[in-house]
Amino acid sequence: MRLLLAEDERELSDALVAILKHNNYSVDAVYNGEDALNYLEADNYDGAILDIMMPKMDGITVLKNIRAQGNDVPVLI
């Protein structure tokens, strides 16, 4: 399963990536909402984990944008 993780706190992001990879997930990590939106527009993911408060764009705004584009990827905020 391929996931996108958007978390602006690097240490937390690194820890979550390590846990997810240890459990056999493929993970791409980004550190702001704008990058999360760009990744979700450019590629197919099985799920996305979004931080609610991030630089450039918050998780709710990312979710609204991807839903407006018709992307129904499962999202955890």
PLM feature spans:
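Two-component/phosphorelay signaling modules centered on CheY-like receiver
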Residues: 10-28, 42, 68
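Active-site residues of response regulator receiver
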Residues: 51
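Short amphipathic alpha-helix used as the core "switch/output" element in two-component signaling
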Residues: 60-71
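Conserved acidic carboxylate
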Residues: 7
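Acidic catalytic/metal-coordinating carboxylates
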Residues: 32, 58-61
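Receiver (REC) domain active-site loop signature in two-component systems and cognate sites
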Residues: 54
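His-Asp phosphorelay/catalytic-motif detector in bacterial-type signaling
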Residues: 44-46, 70-76
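Alpha2 helix of the CheY-like receiver
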Residues: 34-41, 64
